[in-house]
From Swiss-Prot:
The keyword Transmembrane helix does not apply. Transmembrane segments: none annotated. One of two assembly initiator proteins, it binds directly to the 5'-end of the 23S rRNA, where it nucleates assembly of the 50S subunit. One of the proteins that surrounds the polypeptide exit tunnel on the outside of the subunit. GO terms for molecular function: rRNA binding; structural constituent of ribosome. Part of the 50S ribosomal subunit. Gene3D superfamilies: 2.30.30.30. Belongs to the universal ribosomal protein uL24 family. InterPro entries: KOW (IPR005824), Rib_uL2_dom2 (IPR014722), Ribosomal_uL24 (IPR003256), Ribosomal_uL24_CS (IPR005825), Ribosomal_uL24_KOW (IPR041988), Translation_prot_SH3-like_sf (IPR008991). This is Large ribosomal subunit protein uL24. The keyword Cell wall biogenesis/degradation does not apply.
Protein backbone atom coordinates (compact mmCIF):
# COMPACT_ATOMS: atom_id res chain seq x y z
CA UNK A 1 0.00 0.00 0.00
CA UNK A 2 1.42 3.42 -0.89
CA UNK A 3 2.15 5.86 1.92
CA UNK A 4 -0.54 8.50 1.84
CA UNK A 5 0.90 10.18 4.93
CA UNK A 6 4.63 10.80 4.98
CA UNK A 7 7.18 12.43 7.24
CA UNK A 8 6.94 16.27 7.47
CA UNK A 9 3.29 16.29 6.32
CA UNK A 10 0.94 18.64 8.16
CA UNK A 11 -1.91 16.51 9.55
CA UNK A 12 -5.06 17.02 11.59
CA UNK A 13 -6.28 14.50 14.18
CA UNK A 14 -9.74 13.06 13.41
CA UNK A 15 -10.49 11.04 16.57
CA UNK A 16 -9.42 10.72 20.19
CA UNK A 17 -8.47 13.11 22.97
CA UNK A 18 -6.53 15.38 20.58
CA UNK A 19 -9.31 15.62 17.97
CA UNK A 20 -9.02 18.76 15.85
CA UNK A 21 -5.39 19.48 16.70
CA UNK A 22 -2.82 19.95 13.96
CA UNK A 23 0.81 18.94 13.88
CA UNK A 24 3.72 17.80 11.74
CA UNK A 25 4.47 14.09 11.25
CA UNK A 26 7.87 13.35 12.78
CA UNK A 27 8.04 9.61 12.12
CA UNK A 28 6.07 7.00 10.16
CA UNK A 29 6.21 3.37 11.27
CA UNK A 30 5.75 0.43 8.87
CA UNK A 31 2.84 -0.95 10.92
CA UNK A 32 0.61 2.01 9.98
CA UNK A 33 1.29 4.27 12.96
CA UNK A 34 2.63 7.83 12.95
CA UNK A 35 4.22 10.16 15.48
CA UNK A 36 2.84 13.70 15.34
CA UNK A 37 4.61 16.66 16.94
CA UNK A 38 2.80 17.71 20.13
CA UNK A 39 -0.01 15.15 19.77
CA UNK A 40 -0.82 12.09 21.94
CA UNK A 41 1.54 13.07 24.78
CA UNK A 42 1.95 10.38 27.44
CA UNK A 43 3.76 10.37 30.79
CA UNK A 44 6.23 7.54 31.29
CA UNK A 45 7.86 6.52 34.56
CA UNK A 46 11.54 6.02 33.78
CA UNK A 47 14.12 4.49 36.09
CA UNK A 48 17.42 6.27 36.60
CA UNK A 49 20.45 4.81 34.81
CA UNK A 50 23.53 5.97 36.73
CA UNK A 51 25.93 4.35 34.24
CA UNK A 52 24.61 6.64 31.50
CA UNK A 53 24.09 9.60 33.83
CA UNK A 54 20.37 9.50 33.12
CA UNK A 55 18.01 10.79 35.79
CA UNK A 56 14.74 8.98 36.41
CA UNK A 57 11.27 10.32 37.04
CA UNK A 58 8.23 11.30 35.02
CA UNK A 59 9.01 11.93 31.36
CA UNK A 60 6.52 13.27 28.82
CA UNK A 61 6.79 11.65 25.38
CA UNK A 62 4.85 11.51 22.14
CA UNK A 63 3.16 8.18 21.52
CA UNK A 64 2.26 6.72 18.14
CA UNK A 65 -1.21 7.29 16.75
CA UNK A 66 -2.81 5.15 14.05
CA UNK A 67 -2.54 6.65 10.57
CA UNK A 68 -6.29 6.10 10.05
CA UNK A 69 -6.96 8.59 12.87
CA UNK A 70 -5.19 11.46 11.11
CA UNK A 71 -5.83 13.17 7.78
CA UNK A 72 -3.54 15.36 5.74
CA UNK A 73 -4.24 19.09 6.16
CA UNK A 74 -4.87 21.18 3.05
CA UNK A 75 -3.69 24.78 3.69
CA UNK A 76 -5.69 26.18 0.72
CA UNK A 77 -9.06 24.93 2.00
CA UNK A 78 -8.08 24.97 5.72
CA UNK A 79 -9.61 21.50 6.11
CA UNK A 80 -8.65 17.85 6.29
CA UNK A 81 -8.31 16.30 2.86
CA UNK A 82 -7.86 12.97 1.10
CA UNK A 83 -4.79 12.00 -0.89
CA UNK A 84 -4.70 10.61 -4.40
CA UNK A 85 -1.89 9.41 -6.64
CA UNK A 86 -1.27 10.09 -10.32
CA UNK A 87 1.59 10.09 -12.79
CA UNK A 88 2.96 13.40 -14.08
CA UNK A 89 5.97 13.49 -16.42
CA UNK A 90 6.68 9.84 -15.63
CA UNK A 91 6.77 10.43 -11.86
CA UNK A 92 4.19 9.33 -9.32
CA UNK A 93 2.93 12.33 -7.33
CA UNK A 94 0.47 12.83 -4.48
CA UNK A 95 -2.36 15.34 -4.81
CA UNK A 96 -5.24 16.72 -2.73
CA UNK A 97 -8.51 15.20 -3.93
CA UNK A 98 -10.56 18.34 -3.17
CA UNK A 99 -8.70 20.72 -5.49
CA UNK A 100 -6.33 18.42 -7.49
CA UNK A 101 -3.30 20.38 -6.26
CA UNK A 102 0.02 18.53 -5.97
CA UNK A 103 1.29 18.10 -2.42
Amino acid sequence: MPAKIRQNDEVIVLTGKDKGKRGKVTKVLPNGKVFVEGINIITKHEKPVPALGKAGGLVKKEAAIDASNVAIFNPKTNKADRVGFRFEDGKKVRFFKSNNEII
